[in-house]
């Protein structure tokens, strides 16, 4: 039985209890959220070596980190080191987006190495297998696509991105309206090209019940992907994006009816004034399903600094109700991220998530900032470092200060405003 099926029967599972303890809420709160679809409990029934992860309404805003090989760069040891960095830097989940090398072996190694929930995009494996077999991606069969999904379930993958909303109708709306940058989702582009080449509907939409059977078998959460997300501000909130979201809302309801948990993926590149509206639209059309957003990025001109861009957009999106932030690294739009990029991306997204939690009134979020202020007032450097989002960097920066062991840092020295305010005698 799936988590959703048991929640519908009024049963609190062990996974729900573990999530409740971690979140500081009651197990019944988690159960009700799962039943209504506003919370998902993420853990494949074959991936029992990890703690389950709860994502959704009333819970802490979560952060995902992406990793994986490319067709041009295959280094499993580096990817496994990225898994370790994800754990140390405080990510809540990771996704293996590998497209190069022995995809299944890499996925299995990452799942086995991870102590957190693991997601994938199965169409990547299907496409890579087609290329490795010396045939065109366009020659993939529906059976091969579903076989890739089945293998992900067998390997213990906890959630999968599936671009079921990329249909002939939604792609047609993009063609009719026009876009500056076209389709920028890799899975979305593969699917759109496949439909055009084969003059056929997207198999993940046309055979959606087949997908639900696989997801139900392994209790994999479906992350309904935004294959038509905008890749630049000029394309944001256009007809193709909105039509896809309408379809995802309909598919979300069908999945719940089959006791399969669902979250929805969102943009992308969105002008700052449109971010809140995008969240509200998703929550309405998808009946409160958890929203998993990439950024969003409120400007297109910051390659090399897009972790900052994404954190700005992510903070607003999270405050408006987004539940799960996908990190963006400094390498976004430029190259495959290295180890430092992964760390930077996670920290930036965790900052955004914390800002969102303060705005949402999540219990304990504001208290951390109050405690930080107290530590600063007391010149409690160890307390400040331990509480900071990146203790290693905080400690390294402080140790560069000549007065690190005194009451003050090299920024102000004897002119420290806090020191001056505490003095009784004239300076």
Swiss-Prot record:
Keywords: 4Fe-4S, Iron, Iron-sulfur, Lyase, Metal-binding, S-adenosyl-L-methionine, Thiamine biosynthesis, Zinc. One of its GO terms (molecular function) is zinc ion binding. Zn(2+) binds at residues 269, 333. InterPro entries: ThiC, ThiC/Bza_core_dom, ThiC/BzaA/B. Its EC number is 4.1.99.17. Gene3D superfamilies: 6.10.250.620, Radical SAM ThiC family, central domain (3.20.20.540). Substrate binds at residues 66, 95, 124, 163, 185-187, 226-229, 265, 292. Binds 1 [4Fe-4S] cluster per subunit. The cluster is coordinated with 3 cysteines and an exchangeable S-adenosyl-L-methionine. One of its GO terms (cellular component) is cytosol. One of its GO terms (biological process) is thiamine biosynthetic process. [4Fe-4S] cluster binds at residues 409, 412, 416. Its cofactor is [4Fe-4S] cluster. It catalyses: 5-amino-1-(5-phospho-beta-D-ribosyl)imidazole + S-adenosyl-L-methionine = 4-amino-2-methyl-5-(phosphooxymethyl)pyrimidine + CO + 5'-deoxyadenosine + formate + L-methionine + 3 H(+). Pathway: Cofactor biosynthesis; thiamine diphosphate biosynthesis. Pfam families: ThiC_Rad_SAM (PF01964). HAMAP family: ThiC. Homodimer. NCBIfam families: PRK13352.1, thiC. This is Phosphomethylpyrimidine synthase. It comes from Syntrophus aciditrophicus (strain SB).
